[in-house]
Amino acid sequence: MNLDSRIDRIIAEELGRHTHAHKHTPHCNWCWTCPECKSEFVSHVVNHGACRVGAAPGIGQLHDGLAQYIDHTLLKPEGTRAQIETLCKEAAEYHFASVCVNPTWVAFCAHLLRGTGVLVCTVVGFPLGATTTEAKVFEARQVVEQGACEVDMVVNIGRLKSGEYDFVAHDIAEIVKASHPAHVKVIIENCYLTDEEKIKASLLCREAGAHFVKTSTGFGPSGAKIEDVALMRRVVGEHLGVKAAGGIREFQTAEKMIEAGATRLGASASIAIVEHKKVA
């Protein structure tokens, strides 16, 4: 089945979900929430040779494990060296998954975080995604050489909305290749997309070898939405991580995003989230 056919099939399935109540179907394993899905997935991995099955912390235990979901983020253009240094100290203290910073700070963060277990994440083609593939490839190679372990690239939104799926898939695949061994998260910027385009973009990320699909840059008119996270999770299944970013500022929102299928959260209010505090 070619890419266009797979896209059409998944769109039909997902749009059908909006007109029918959720029930167990042959494709229900994409939801990752109902008991049938979880049971079938565990049986599947055991039957294929797994001798142990691990699970992320349940929602009830998030107060202990939530920090491991969070990319502690400072992407504002006015961020100073002192603020970046504070970001790294906080990430090491709270054991966040990573710091997410602009490329100019990657080497500095890699030096500060050496030996802490906190990864350095950065952005490519940010925040518009409209630079050439060649420019993104150059950026990706450079930041990985400087110590980035994760690269959050922005999809070419205009090409996606123009239906140029081969171009978009190639763009993603080239950054995945250039970033190796770092993992790539593809920001599809949901605020500009229809549901059909979100499905197409998520599938293209999977086909192109990305490691995560991500909701938002945080610089668009809106950020992560629970329904988008759930949709992206259903489309990519267990194959990719899902990162929710933009507007996540309190524990309750973070909890709902994870419950919907997010395996990573991008946030600048990370400490307030893990300490259950309100941010003005």
Where are these regions (language model features)?
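Exposed alpha-helical structural elements
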Residues: 2, 6, 10, 41, ...
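Short hydrophobic "strand-cap" motifs at the C-terminus of beta-strands
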Residues: 245
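Generic surface-pattern signal
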Residues: 12-16, 20, 47, 58, ...
